[in-house]
């Protein structure tokens, strides 16, 4: 239940990046200049 609240919070966005495949794609684009 606590994880569900964390995922909804923007603060955990960084932690959810590794859990969410969609967020990982966004971060990969930020790392690359493409």
UniProtKB/Swiss-Prot annotation:
Residue segments, region Disordered: 1-34
Listed Basic residues bias regions: 25-34
Domain of life: Eukaryota
Protein name, entry field: Uncharacterized protein C27E2.14
UniProt source species: Schizosaccharomyces pombe (strain 972 / ATCC 24843)
